[in-house]
Every structure is written in structure tokens, then in C-alpha cells.
Amino acid sequence: MTPKQVERIKNKITKIKRELSADKKRWGGYYDDSRGLRYLPPELYLKISDYSGALRYYNWFDKNFPDDCGFPIFLFEWTITLFKTKRIKQAEKKAMETFYSNTYLIDKFLNKEFLDFDKSENSNWEYSSLAEQLIYSKDQNELIDFADWLENFIKTEKFYAFANKFIGIESVLKTEPIGEKRTKLVKEKYKM
């Protein structure tokens, strides 16, 4: 990437931050951001390999949008950022959140066959088609170290236990009628 391209990306980030600041002023100290601008900067930071900038942005996001769980690709970018800034325990947790939000993204990144199991996909964020929008791959030079770490992490007992529990709950929820058992399963899923 040329210095001019890096400068353009930095200018985009600045413009988005300005628009978010104006949005907060417009709404009397609160954000509306119905355009979803808050989700754009991480991809831009990652394009220029500014992982500390991305981390600062995620800290800001967490503080200003505490009830926003993000969307799967955003969470995946957060996982990359945490890994690249040597926050491995947090990266593990975020990788599991990514899997929870979309079971296909990690497989897509690692060029693996999609995990196929019978589950209900209640949100368009959960569909396999979302994974096709992932612009990151284990083959990208700047992500080789992350890919190695992620490949190893998804083979750990910690990840297996999490994934198996999640898949088990999802499989039962697909056919479980409304009632006490379903309510208990939903609560258990949201505690994960």
C-alpha cells in the first residue's frame, strides 16, 4: 500500500469519527447512527495494519455502545485486533463470541469446509451467506500468525467445549416447542 493510500484511509477514519461526533451532538449526547458508521473503522484500521488504533477504537465503541453486541464480521475483526495487540485471553473470548454469532466465519477464514449442523438461523447474521462477505483469509501475509493461532485455538478443549455446548443447544432449540424447557435452553445459551 502506498503512503497516499494509507493517508486516504486515515482520512476516511477521521471523517467517520467526525460524523459520529456530529451524530452524538444532534441527538443530545446520545448516538443514533442508524447508518451503521460505527462498524466501519475497524476494517479500515486493519487495512493499514494499525492494530493499536483499532484497539483504541474498540475501547471507544465498548464505552459508547455498551448494549451493541456488534455483528459477526465486526467481532472477527475485533478478534484479529486483540490477537495482534497481544491480548490473547481476550482474543480467545472474542473468537468464541464470533463463533456464537456466526458458526461459518472461522471456517471461511481458515478455508475449511463449513460446519453443517441442524440449527435454527433466526437472524440474517447467522447465515452462511454472510461468510461470503468476509474479506480476510489465512493466506494474507499480515494474518498468517493470526491464522496459526486461530487454527490451534479452535482445537483446544476450551473451544471444543464451548462449540459443542452451543451446537447442542442450537440443535435442540430447532425443534423444541415453546415452554419451560425451551426457556431454560434459551437462557443457558445467552449465558454462554
Language model regions located:
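TPR repeat positional signature
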Residues: 38, 75, 82, 113-114
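Solenoid-like repeat scaffolds
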Residues: 21-32, 59-69, 96-105
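Conserved positions within tetratricopeptide repeat
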Residues: 10, 55-56, 92-96, 163
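Helix-turn-helix repeat elements of alpha-solenoid scaffolds
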Residues: 5-20, 45-58
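Residue-level signature for tetratricopeptide repeat
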Residues: 43-45, 81-82
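Long, ordered, amphipathic alpha-helical scaffolds
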Residues: 105-192
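Generic helix N-cap/helix-start motif at coil->alpha-helix transitions
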Residues: 1-3, 30-39, 69-75
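TPR/TPR-like (Sel1-like) alpha-helical repeat modules
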Residues: 82-106, 132-136
